């Protein structure tokens, strides 16, 4: 509730011309209607306002006691989180990691900005294609539960995939901050192959 809006209403000539009962009725209706437009504010409201609360809320809800933080690396946010989680497992910081990514378009500001800089495709997404002319915004969430392979095998867990290596890079100065730089992508791939001790010629897509 913004008292400034009420003060502006009080200052109008039309409001001043009303008797005290009419003024009180209008102010009461003003506050009631304004508050009706706002969702109740609880501790679950904060993840939508402060990204660093997201991981903390998950830890709180599931009573998790290890380190928790939110990684923001734009499109690579999920990979950055997975890389950090995997490193912590290998370093013995914890035995299980819950990691992943979530993206929601909470308002029109982000959409408008991407439109203004020409980052959004006017028709559709065409990854790895010469006709690519931008990206299409989407929403979604995905969570992975990670363990060291030996621990998962010992505990009889169902194993969906094994992470053999991870590579990351920044594109540096290229076409633009929103456009991929092929050299940066190559660096990431080389680091992933090296981390996994795999020769690229052995990989079949």
Name these PLM-found stretches.
Residues 1-205:
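Condensing-enzyme catalytic core of the thiolase-fold
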């Amino acid at each position: 509730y913004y008292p400034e809006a009420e003060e502006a209403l009080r200052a109008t000539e039309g409001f001043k011309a009303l008797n005290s009962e009419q003024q009180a009725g209008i102010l009461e209706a003003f506050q009631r209607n304004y508050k009706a437009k706002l969702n109740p504010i609880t501790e679950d409201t904060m993840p939508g306002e402060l990204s660093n609360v997201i991981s903390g809320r998950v830890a709180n809800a599931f009573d998790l006691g290890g380190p928790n933080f939110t990684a923001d690396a734009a499109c690579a946010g999920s990979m950055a989180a997975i890389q950090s989680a995997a490193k912590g497992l290998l370093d013995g910081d914890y035995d299980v990691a819950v990691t992943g990514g979530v993206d929601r378009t909470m308002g029109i500001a982000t959409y408008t900005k991407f439109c203004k800089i020409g980052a959004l495709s006017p028709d559709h997404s065409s990854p790895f294609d010469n006709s690519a002319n931008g990206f299409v915004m989407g929403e979604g969430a995905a969570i992975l539960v990670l363990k060291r392979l030996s621990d998962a095998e010992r505990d009889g867990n169902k194993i969906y995939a094994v992470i053999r290596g991870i590579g990351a890079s920044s594109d540096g100065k290229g076409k633009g901050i929103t456009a991929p730089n092929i050299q940066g992508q190559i660096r990431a791939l080389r680091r992933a192959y090296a981390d996994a001790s795999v020769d690229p010629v052995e990989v079949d897509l």
